Amino acid sequence: MKTYNVAIVGASGAVGQELIKGLENSFFPIKKFVPLASARSAGKKIRAFNKDYEILETTHEVFEKEEIDIAFFSAGGSVSEEFAISASKTALVIDNTSFFRLNKDVPLVVPEINAQEIFNAPLNIIANPNCSTIQMTQILNPLHLHFKIKSVIVSTYQAVSGAGNKGIESLKNELKTALEHLEKDPAIDLNQVLQAGAFAYPIAFNAIAHIDTFKENGYTKEELKMVHETHKIMGVDFPISATCVRVPVLRSHSESLSIAFEKEFDLKEVYEVLKNAPSVVVCDDPSHNLYPTPLKASHTDSVFIGRLRKDLFDKKTLHGFCVADQLRVGAATNALKIALHYIKNA
């Protein structure tokens, strides 16, 4: 079996760490592993494959020098903008950032939906979609193929780790501060003691309807990503409206979906379609309190869907609630599936 020299740009970050775990657990045919990061992190040690590796600085020359075959980028859009083209001259680049996603020469891939696009990459770069988009499309695509979707309204409840390690630390620190003050005074106004960390407002005991920057039309970039990326991945143009909210959950994103079909549908057929969809787990028995939760979805590679029900007033509309680990399903696992499909079929 052929083996590959693999680099991870942003190896010490939240997604980078999940990529390492995924590479270890998938028995990926690695010949050499090269962790890369900024000059600030270069020289530090990182644990992978039961040994310590020295992090190298990300430069334009390092990919050719280290003879990298596959490079995963998970260090932010500005890093991908600066270095991905250089890396793609000698390596297949799988980019976890938003920088290349809507580039017409870069395929945007969810392998369960459009794996064939992996081999339509003239720049030798493949984009990994937004985490919220990945889990949503894995529900929408099988339903669209069977019923034909007319429109979608989605509201997200996104974990702090979607903002990286700084998001995790903000929640931990703010919870500690809040609980210390609540212990002394249960009626205290937390607005007086909490300060914003990684987000626009304190995230502890809060919900913030603001992910990424606001655009002139009132939507955030995160909300528009879900619209435009879904259209590109699925090859559709039906209306999608998204509202994205950050919640004080450590890991796994949740989404409330309202899906309008072109015709009336049989709910039993919906269950059958989703039960047979790849990477989807139907978790739906309200009589036994069985429905998806972020805690249950964490550290798994499935998209969980439940609370499936017809709209009370519109027989063509389906409601549901889906949850997935955004660091795995929404980033690392999807990127690894792209790489595995590539080496299996190249």
Curated annotation (Swiss-Prot):
Gene Ontology molecular function: aspartate-semialdehyde dehydrogenase activity; NAD binding; NADP binding; protein dimerization activity
SUPFAM superfamilies: Glyceraldehyde-3-phosphate dehydrogenase-like, C-terminal domain (SSF55347), NAD(P)-binding Rossmann-fold domains (SSF51735)
Recorded catalytic activity of this chain's protein: L-aspartate 4-semialdehyde + phosphate + NADP(+) = 4-phospho-L-aspartate + NADPH + H(+)
Binding sites annotated in the UniProt record for NADP(+): 12-15, 40-41, 161-162, 326
InterPro entries, sorted: Asp-semialdehyde_DH_CS, Asp_semialdehyde_DH, Asp_semialdehyde_DH_beta, NAD(P)-bd_dom_sf, Semialdehyde_DH_NAD-bd, Semialdhyde_DH_dimer_dom
Active site positions: 131 (acyl-thioester intermediate), 253 (proton acceptor)
Amino-acid positions noted as binding substrate in the UniProt annotation, renumbered to this chain: 158, 246
Alphabetic keyword roster: Amino-acid biosynthesis, Diaminopimelate biosynthesis, Lysine biosynthesis, Methionine biosynthesis, NADP, Oxidoreductase, Threonine biosynthesis
Pfam families to which the protein is assigned, alphabetical: Semialdhyde_dh, Semialdhyde_dhC
Pathway assigned to this chain's UniProt record: Amino-acid biosynthesis; L-lysine biosynthesis via DAP pathway; (S)-tetrahydrodipicolinate from L-aspartate: step 2/4; Amino-acid biosynthesis; L-methionine biosynthesis via de novo pathway; L-homoserine from L-aspartate: step 2/3; Amino-acid biosynthesis; L-threonine biosynthesis; L-threonine from L-aspartate: step 2/5
Function: Catalyzes the NADPH-dependent formation of L-aspartate-semialdehyde (L-ASA) by the reductive dephosphorylation of L-aspartyl-4-phosphate.
Similarity comment text for this entry: Belongs to the aspartate-semialdehyde dehydrogenase family.
Subunit structure as annotated in this protein's UniProt entry: Homodimer.
Protein name: Aspartate-semialdehyde dehydrogenase
